[in-house]
């Protein structure tokens, strides 16, 4: 009998404890599965960038070797990704690119250079973006990670974006870096402006294509078939990105604001760059004094001086402020500043 009781007790201890439907544990589990609130760069005024950690808490992404590339084709031409260090920084966090109906430019920008070309040949440089896999993703904010969320949506027809300065001679390619800064990404399936059409929450890989032709036989860019051309295709794994309609990872938002020269208006309410923000407190106080109180006082005195010139009788009202007579005191200046202001009445 005692053995049976002991056995029954063990069975009860081994049974999983059922949590009430509305328990705190259940509520916390549901919160864990919620999707992140989208944050676009236009809304960063509500984001405290100083509170965002500089490193992502998620697991390592297996950073690719800088300069590593995959090459396909029948030409001996070599291609190098310029700015690969910046791309690697974004890759470590999980690069995101905004797509809109009207089209949005990429940052970082795809920039490449070429070697082993024929100097007098013609070269056409293309960029396209292809899906990495057949999955759709979602971003889990409290885990700082992208997770699969089902099968991919139908893939839009692939487009090649021809660099607007094509064709290049081999000599020109050796002397210049080819930048696709004007390339735009869109989610408009009926786009007719030549933008690259992508699906949001899908992962993509940019590719560079170079097609060689002789000057006597130029290429029609609207009828190009890569497999029928003398060409090479280059893929740099660190340029992979997630297409989004609003930035999901706040670390990506922070890095884009820091590195994108067109986002300087979002960096600091005072307009200071990161280098200026690292200056000593004394320098910052001096700079703030010059740009605020000194400048405002000088402007006020200039307006007052002009008013007194037009109506000298008003001076009677300011005897307590200016006891020296008709002369206004000079505005304070900052020694050594090339833009010193010192305004006196004439």
UniProtKB/Swiss-Prot annotation:
Disruption phenotype: RNAi-mediated knockdown by injection into the gonad results in male progeny with grossly abnormal tails with no spicules. Hermaphrodite progeny are constipated and show backward uncoordination. Residues 33-66 are annotated as: Disordered. One of its GO terms (cellular component) is nucleus. Keywords: Developmental protein, DNA-binding, Nucleus, Transcription, Transcription regulation. Residues 33-48 have a biased composition (Acidic residues). Its main location: nucleus. It comes from the Eukaryota. GO terms for molecular function: DNA-binding transcription factor activity, RNA polymerase II-specific; RNA polymerase II cis-regulatory region sequence-specific DNA binding. Pfam families: T-box (PF00907). It is found in: Nucleus. GO terms for biological process: cell fate specification; heart development; locomotion; negative regulation of transcription by RNA polymerase II; nematode male tail tip morphogenesis; positive regulation of DNA-templated transcription; post-embryonic hindgut morphogenesis; regulation of transcription by RNA polymerase II. Residues 86-268 bind DNA. Transcription factor. Involved in cell fate determination; required to pattern the posterior hindgut. Involved in motor neuron fate determination and maintenance, acting as a transcriptional repressor to counteract gene activation by transcription factor unc-3 in a subset of motor neurons. Required throughout development to repress transcription by unc-3, probably acting by binding to specific promoter elements. Represses expression of VA and VB motor neuron-specific effector genes, such as DEG/ENaC channel del-1 and the innexin inx-12, in DA and DB motor neurons. PANTHER family: T-BOX PROTEIN-RELATED, T-BOX TRANSCRIPTION FACTOR TBX20. This is T-box protein 12. The lineage of its organism: Eukaryota, Metazoa, Ecdysozoa, Nematoda, Chromadorea.
């Amino acid at each position: 009998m005692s053995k049976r009781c002991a056995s029954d007790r063990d069975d009860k201890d081994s049974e999983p404890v059922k949590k009430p439907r509305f328990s705190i544990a259940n509520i916390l589990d549901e919160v864990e599965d919620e999707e992140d609130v989208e944050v676009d760069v236009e809304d960063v005024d509500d984001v405290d960038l100083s509170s965002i950690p500089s490193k992502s808490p998620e697991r390592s992404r297996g950073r690719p070797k800088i300069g590593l590339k995959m090459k396909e084709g029948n030409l001996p031409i070599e291609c190098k990704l310029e700015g690969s260090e910046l791309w690697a920084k974004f890759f470590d966090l999980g690069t995101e690119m905004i797509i809109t109906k009207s089209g949005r430019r990429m940052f970082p920008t795809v920039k490449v250079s070429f070697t082993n070309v024929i100097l007098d040949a013609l070269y056409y440089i293309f960029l396209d973006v292809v899906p990495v896999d057949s999955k759709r993703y979602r971003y889990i904010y409290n885990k700082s990670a992208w997770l699969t969320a089902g099968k991919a949506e139908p893939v839009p027809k692939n487009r090649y974006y021809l660099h607007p300065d094509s064709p290049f001679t081999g000599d020109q390619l050796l002397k210049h870096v080819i930048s696709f800064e004007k390339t735009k990404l869109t989610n408009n399936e009926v786009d007719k402006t030549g933008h690259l059409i992508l699906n949001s929450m899908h992962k993509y890989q940019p590719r560079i294509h170079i097609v060689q032709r002789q000057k006597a036989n130029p290429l029609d860019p609207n009828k190009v078939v890569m497999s029928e051309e003398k060409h090479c295709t280059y893929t740099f794994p660190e340029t992979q990105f997630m297409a989004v309609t609003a930035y999901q990872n706040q670390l990506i938002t922070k890095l884009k604001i820091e590195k994108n020269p067109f986002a300087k208006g979002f960096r600091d309410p005072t307009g200071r760059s990161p280098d200026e923000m690292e200056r000593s407190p004394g320098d910052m106080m001096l700079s703030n004094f010059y740009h605020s109180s000194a400048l405002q006082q000088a402007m006020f005195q200039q307006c007052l001086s002009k008013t007194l010139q037009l109506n000298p009788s008003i001076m009677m009202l300011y005897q307590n402020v200016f006891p020296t007579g008709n002369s206004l005191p000079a505005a304070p200046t900052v020694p050594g500043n090339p833009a010193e202001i010192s305004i006196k009445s004439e």
